[in-house]
UniProtKB/Swiss-Prot annotation:
Homotetramer. This is L-lactate dehydrogenase. Pfam families: Ldh_1_C, Ldh_1_N. The lineage of its organism: Bacteria, Thermotogati, Deinococcota, Deinococci, Deinococcales. Its main location: cytoplasm. GO terms for cellular component: cytoplasm. Beta-D-fructose 1,6-bisphosphate binds at R148, H163. InterPro entries: L-lactate/malate_DH, L-lactate_DH, L-lactate_DH_AS, Lactate/malate_DH_C, Lactate/malate_DH_N, Lactate_DH/Glyco_Ohase_4_C, NAD(P)-bd_dom_sf.
C-alpha cells in the first residue's frame, strides 16, 4: 500500500511520521518544491522504520506518486498576521490550480486527501480540478477529537469512551452537536448525572470554547499545530487503504448545502462511501446552515 504526501512542512512531515509509526502503509513518498527539505524529512522518518513497521520511505517528484492509493495534500501558504481568510484562500487556490493537475496525472486512481486551509473550500476546488477522482478533506476530524478529549477529561474517562461530532466548517462557524454526544454509551447529560458531575451551560460553554479555540491556544505557545492533525490524517488514510468503513467527520461536497463541509461520513477504499445526517436540535440545524452560508460566501467571492 502506497501513500504520497505533497508538502513536507510541519503537518505533512508529522502525518508521514504518524503513518510510519502506525504501520499504515508499506511505501511512503514525500514530495515538496523544496527538494532538500523533502529529502531530509524522508531520511529522518526512514530512520524510524527499523524500530516501528519497516515502511519504505523516500522523496521524489510528482512522478513518484504513481500507483499511490492515497495522496495527502498539505501544501500551501500559512495565514500571516493581518491577512484575511479570503487572502489566504486566493493564495492557496492558486497553488492548488498548479499542483492538483500534476498529482492527478501521476496518480489518477488515488484518493486525494486535502488538509491545506481553508480545507473545506480547497476540497471544493480540488474536486473541480480532479473530476471523477475521489477527493476528501480532513474537515473536522481533528475538531471532533478535541471535542471528545475535553468531554472525556470532564467525565474522568478514557478519551476513546467519549463520542461526539463537530459539524460544518473547519473554522469559526463549526457546530458542536451536543444532542448526539455520548459518554460510555450514555447521553452525555445522563452520564454526568449518574457520576454526580456538574453538567450545565457553563461546563458546555467551556468545552465548546476549548474545542473552538484549541488551535489558537496551541499556536500562541508553539507557533503551529501538527501532532493532532498528523494523527488524524493517518487515521483517515488507514480508513481508505484498509477499507475500514470508518465513520469520520471528513469534508466533502454536500449538494444540499452547496459547498464542501463536514458531516459524519462512511470512509473506505473509494473515499466517501455515504453521508450520515445525525438528528439535530433546531438550534444546531440553524447553526449548521449558517456555517454552510459562511462557506458559500467565500466560495462565491473566489468564483468557485
Amino acid at each position: 500500500m502506497k501513500v504520497g504526501v505533497v508538502g513536507t512542512g510541519f503537518v505533512g512531515s508529522t502525518a508521514a511520521f504518524a503513518l510510519v509509526l502506525r504501520g499504515s502503509c508499506s511505501e511512503l513518498v514525500l514530495v515538496d518544491r523544496d527538494e532538500d527539505r523533502a529529502q531530509a524529512e524522508a531520511e529522518d522518518i526512514a530512520h524510524a522504520a527499523p524500530v516501528s513497521h519497516g515502511t519504505r520511505v523516500w522523496h521524489g517528484g510528482h512522478s513518484e506518486l504513481a500507483d499511490a492509493q492515497v495522496v495527502i495534500l498539505t501544501a500551501g501558504a500559512n495565514q500571516k498576521p493581518g491577512e484575511s481568510r479570503l487572502d489566504l484562500l486566493e493564495k492557496n487556490a492558486d497553488i492548488f490550480r498548479e499542483l492538483v493537475p500534476q498529482i492527478t496525472r501521476a496518480a489518477p486512481d488515488a484518493v486525494l486527501l486535502v488538509t491545506s486551509n481553508p480545507v473545506d473550500l480547497l476540497t471544493d476546488l480540488a474536486t473541480q480540478l480532479a473530476p471523477g477522482q475521489p477527493v476528501i478533506g480532513s474537515g473536522t476530524v481533528l475538531d471532533s477529537a478535541r471535542f471528545r478529549h475535553l468531554m472525556a477529561q470532564h467525565a474522568g474517562v478514557d478519551g476513546t469512551h467519549a463520542h461526539g461530532y463537530v459539524l460544518g466548517e473547519h473554522g469559526d462557524s463549526e457546530v458542536l452537536a451536543w444532542s448526539s454526544a455520548m459518554v460510555a454509551g450514555m447521553p452525555v447529560a445522563d452520564f454526568m448525572q449518574a457520576q454526580n458531575l456538574p453538567w450545565n451551560e457553563q461546563v458546555r460553554a467551556k468545552i465548546d470554547e476549548g474545542t473552538r479555540n484549541a488551535a489558537a491556544s496551541i499556536i500562541e505557545g508553539k507557533r503551529a499545530t501538527y501532532y493532532g492533525i498528523g494523527a488524524a490524517l493517518a487515521r483517515i488514510t488507514e480508513a481508505v487503504l484498509r477499507d475500514r468503513r470508518a465513520v469520520l467527520t471528513v469534508s466533502a461536497p454536500t449538494p444540499e448545502y452547496g459547498v464542501s463541509l463536514s458531516l459524519p461520513r462512511v470512509v473506505g477504499r473509494q473515499g466517501v462511501l455515504s453521508t450520515l445526517h445525525p438528528k439535530l436540535t433546531g438550534d444546531e440545524q440553524q447553526k449548521l446552515e449558517q456555517s454552510a452560508g459562511v462557506l458559500r460566501g467565500f466560495k462565491q467571492q473566489l468564483g468557485l
